[in-house]
Amino acid sequence: NIFIIDDTISRNIALGVPDDLVDHAMLINSIKQSKLAVLIKQMPEGVNTLLGESGIQLSGGQRQRIALARAFYHNREILVMDEATSALDTETESEIVNEIKLLKGNKTLIVIAHRLSTVKHCDYIYKIDKGKIVKKGNYESVIGED
């Protein structure tokens, strides 16, 4: 579940940052990275559009992209992405995975995914079956054998 407050797109992305301290360049960049720009242009108030309680007016994929924009905006050293693209179409997922690849070498990413395309860029993969690690290594050694 993605935590969305009953507030604007901007405040949901920069969650926890006082309005006067929001870095608008970082906000715009995180919107671009999460592929939200087209959606936001269609919204009546742009980044100032109210999302409603729990983002009720958004699809699952749109809520995921708000969460990704938040992760990109806050620029943490470690990002945990648990099925972060599961509700996205394959084209949008591919675009976002390309953005995530750009973080390689600068961030520690822990990616939990069922779609193999999501983890293809990872340095190290753990394959878990019934709660146990059954394989580990790079993409080719873990997935290539299946």
PLM regions and their residue ranges:
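Hydrophobic anchor residue at the start of the ABC signature
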Residues: 68, 112
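A short, proline-enriched helix->beta-strand linker immediately N-terminal to the Walker B motif
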Residues: 73-77, 106
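Conserved catalytic loops of ABC-family nucleotide-binding domains
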Residues: 102-111, 119
